[in-house]
Amino acid sequence: MSASKMAMSNLEKILELVPLSPTSFVTKYLPAAPVGSKGTFGGTLVSQSLLASLHTVPLNFFPTSLHSYFIKGGDPRTKITYHVQNLRNGRNFIHKQVSAYQHDKLIFTSMILFAVQRSKEHDSLQHWETIPGLQGKQPDPHRYEEATSLFQKEVLDPQKLSRYASLSDRFQDATSMSKYVDAFQYGVMEYQFPKDMFYSARHTDELDYFVKVRPPITTVEHAGDESSLHKHHPYRIPKSITPENDARYNYVAFAYLSDSYLLLTIPYFHNLPLYCHSFSVSLDHTIYFHQLPHVNNWIYLKISNPRSHWDKHLVQGKYFDTQSGRIMASVSQEGYVVYGSERDIRAKF
């Protein structure tokens, strides 16, 4: 495997931040655009804003929700600066606001709520949305297929590729197509998609698939050298947060994956082929964290599209832990996505 392909799955390197001050950070590397896009990947902004804020809260505080807005398209040719503002420090909750800048202009903002970790004995009322039979489940090979091979069969097959090429010029570019394959095969996320993922003829209100993160991330709280310090000084601010030393990096990784193949799935609910949009931009992104997301395990995702109107589309996702069957996170995103008429798309495809 080439160095460039290995770098595609190096999440720590992709998201790495350099401190400018205790509350300001700059990206170490340029923020990449996803395949087929000109702007910075939204998941990079969401996850880096969370990572920046984690550098300013004590070890025993965990994120419970994140509300963010994409204000201006990110420039992949310029590093991003993040400023973390402390809104409130309480005994049980901490509120942070993170602002991202390029060229001295605000491009993204997020508000993040952290809650102190409580003892299990404290919990009184409990309820978890659970999917029966999901516990310990692996993707059914009769219904799901690894994304790389599915893309090659359902999109890159010469006969089918010509149909996609009629919708967009990028499908006439062999280099661009190889980038899609590389992203599926070597990228941060590994997917198991339903076999009709790229073009579904059935009418449905729900899309489900499996996803996990390839690079290993610890689930042991404060697994690095700071573990003993955490035991005696839980309110200590960490010196560093990496996939190896802090289980809270799972939240960062989840924030990254939560913006991938979410808004892009809108055509699935309208019996249109994926990638048939002419313009797409995310407007906002909200995450509710219900538990520590173990991102190296398969995560089962159920997506719905409650509303599409006047080029504004709302998608919602429920993410379930396949080890327990319990819901681990809920995500909502609205985007401004422009499509041609359904009749024209179907006629071309």
Swiss-Prot record:
Induction: Up-regulated by oleic acid.
Record: active site: 259, 282, 333
Motif Microbody targeting signal in this chain: 347-349
Its EC number(s): 3.1.2.2
Signal peptide: none
Alphabetized InterPro entries for the sequence: Acyl-CoA_hotdog (IPR042171), Acyl_CoA_thio (IPR003703), HotDog_dom_sf (IPR029069), TesB_ACOT8-like_N (IPR049449), TesB_C (IPR025652)
Any one GO molecular function term: carboxylic ester hydrolase activity
Gene3D superfamilies per UniProt: Acyl-CoA thioesterase, double hotdog domain
Catalysed reaction equations from the record: hexadecanoyl-CoA + H2O = hexadecanoate + CoA + H(+)
Transmembrane residue ranges: none
Subcellular location: Peroxisome
Gene Ontology cellular component terms for the protein in this record: mitochondrion; peroxisomal matrix; peroxisome
This protein's UniProt keywords: Hydrolase, Peroxisome, Serine esterase
Entry coiled-coil feature ranges: none
GO biological process: acyl-CoA metabolic process; fatty acid beta-oxidation; fatty acid catabolic process; fatty acid oxidation
NCBIfam families: tesB
Protein family (similarity comment): Belongs to the C/M/P thioester hydrolase family.
Function in brief: Acyl-coenzyme A (acyl-CoA) thioesterases are a group of enzymes that catalyze the hydrolysis of acyl-CoAs to the free fatty acid and coenzyme A (CoASH), providing the potential to regulate intracellular levels of acyl-CoAs, free fatty acids and CoASH. Contributes to growth on fatty acids.
Protein name, per record: Peroxisomal acyl-coenzyme A thioester hydrolase 1
Organism: Saccharomyces cerevisiae (strain ATCC 204508 / S288c)
Gene that this sequence comes from: TES1
